[in-house]
Design a protein with these regions (language model features):
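ABC ATPase nucleotide-binding domains
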Residues: 74-235
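Helix-to-loop junction immediately C-terminal to a conserved catalytic motif
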Residues: 52
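ABC ATPase nucleotide-binding domain
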Residues: 6, 13, 27, 63, ...
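The feature captures the beta-strand-to-loop junction immediately N-terminal to the Walker
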Residues: 37-39
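Non-catalytic connector elements of ABC transporters
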Residues: 251-458
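ATP-binding/catalytic-site motifs of ATP-hydrolyzing domains
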Residues: 61, 67, 212
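Conserved post-Walker A/P-loop segment of ABC ATPase nucleotide-binding domains
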Residues: 55-63
Length: 458
């Protein structure tokens, strides 16, 4: 039997009232595969532990199949958890590790049949008599998954189970997990910071930032219609191009978005989404362009290709800009070209894990002799620099965002490897305005308009 899991305004606070999860509401349908996605420290593992009963819920309600579950002990929730570090007993063989929860559940029963059936399902029959120290990382994770599956739980909770494995093994096990959970039809909540895992595994993806739910939707919808600039920047490889823009909407002229040295002219007649941008006249916005929304002008491409094929015509709704080649990343089947268009990149904070900030020590005059003050100063010098994690009572200082490393160019474009490009070359580009995202200064999406979503073909 699989189960429904519902969270209503769930919060988790630790010492001094610091909230790591803030009023989270989620409904997970029976048999659904939901992925909790976000940067390190966003609270996704804490949510998983609250569902499992390993963390107390500070506020809000957890419902399991519609029944109040806040006070249920972990053993009464009928869930199985798969951990990042495998958590196998080193003095037990794989057979004993898989059968351990069955022996605890029914001490008098023989678990051999269920252990063998689980091993066949995972293809690990030849590993049953080995100890964890004799297994590779991928084999250990398969055994850990077998231990969870053998119980026939009503829900799987997986906390970054693939993060300790190499890339090739991650891809292989990702496919195995997807196939296995669909065959079993068990409700699965999967935590990861890897968007590739989230997009390939989940029926739905819930994006968290600082303990707050940003968006929950299908992988396709989260990519195609990010609710805010954080989701847009966190989802997608390469990362979406985010540029600062200024809306200009004169009554007697064409509507444009200035990017600094160049501008995007919105094609007429204006679409409904673009008409709604008129209210942003004279305001700064954030323009989002994914790498597939910009392409090299076909005329330039044709003259640069070794094939000499005729140039296709530009598509309706494309507008022209130019870019200077600053860097190229050869990927084999494609090339990611970094262009300098004279635009100002927009920075989205908290895309990675927050780190303690080094701050200068504020010295105050203290009472005492000159000798005492010199002794204190000598002690401070011996101790070295101090990392301040908490601030004394008083007005909170303004948050200081750590400067991001400067990347070459301000616009990344996908292209094919047969186009001859060189550093410093001026290249004509075409921007597909239909794929344009516009966010306001708070980071909320205003184009496409949030209350009128385009039709997404399944």
């Amino acid at each position: 039997m699989t189960r429904a899991i519902s969270l209503y305004d769930v919060s988790k606070a630790y010492a001094k009232g610091v909230r790591v999860v803030d009023r989270l509401s989620l409904d997970i349908a029976p048999g659904e595969f939901l992925v909790l996605l976000g940067p390190s420290g966003c609270g996704k593992s804490t949510v998983l532990r609250m569902i499992a009963g390993l963390e107390e819920i500070t506020d809000g309600q957890l419902l399991l199949d519609g029944e109040y579950g806040n006070d249920l002990p972990p053993s009464g929730r009928d869930m199985a958890m798969v951990f990042q570090n495998f958590a196998l007993y080193p003095n037990m063989t794989s057979r004993d590790n898989i059968g351990f929860p069955l022996r605890i559940e029914s001490p008098g029963a023989d678990p051999a049949g269920r252990v063998d059936a689980t091993a066949r399902m995972l293809g690990i029959e030849d590993l049953l008599d080995r100890f964890p120290s004799q297994l590779s990382g991928g084999e250990r994770q398969r055994v850990a998954m077998g231990r969870a599956i053998s119980r026939h739980p009503s829900a799987f909770l997986m906390d970054e189970p693939l993060s300790n494995l190499d890339a090739k093994l991650r891809n292989h096990l990702r496919a195995e997990i997807s196939k296995l959970t669909r065959e079993l039809g068990v409700t699965t909540v999967y935590v990861t910071h890897d968007q590739s895992e989230a997009m390939s595994l989940g029926d739905r993806v819930a994006v968290l930032r600082g303990g707050v739910l940003q968006q929950v939707d299908t992988p396709r919808a989260v990519y195609a219609l990010p609710r805010n600039v954080f989701v847009a920047a966190f989802i997608g490889t390469p990362r979406i191009n985010l540029l600062r823009g200024l809306v200009r909407a004169p009554l007697d002229g064409a509507m444009t978005i200035s990017l600094g040295k160049q501008f995007l002219r919105l094609p007429e007649p204006l679409s409904l989404d673009h008409q709604l941008l008129r209210v942003q006249q004279g305001r700064e916005v954030i323009v989002g362009l994914r790498s597939e929304a910009v392409r090299i002008d076909p005329k330039f491409s044709a003259s640069s290709r070794r094939t000499g094929a005729p140039a296709p015509a530009a598509r309706p709704g494309e507008v022209a800009i130019t870019g200077l080649v600053e860097h190229m990343e050869f990927q084999g089947h494609e090339v990611l070209v970094h262009f300098n268009t004279g635009s100002r990149p927009a920075v989205v904070p908290d895309l990675e894990a927050p780190r303690p900030t080094r701050r200068p020590i504020r010295r105050r005059r203290r009472e005492g002799t000159v000798l005492n003050r010199l002794r204190d100063r000598a002690g401070a010098l011996r101790a070295g620099p101090v990392v301040v994690l908490e601030h004394p009572a008083g007005p909170a200082p303004e948050p200081v965002a750590a400067p991001e490393p400067r990347l070459p160019g301000d616009l990344v474009v996908r292209t094919t490897p047969d186009i001859d490009l060189r550093h410093g070359m001026q290249v004509p580009l075409l921007v597909d305005i239909a794929r344009l995202f516009v966010f306001d200064q708070r980071g909320e999406r205003i184009c496409p308009a949030p209350d009128r979503l385009p039709d997404l073909e399944e």
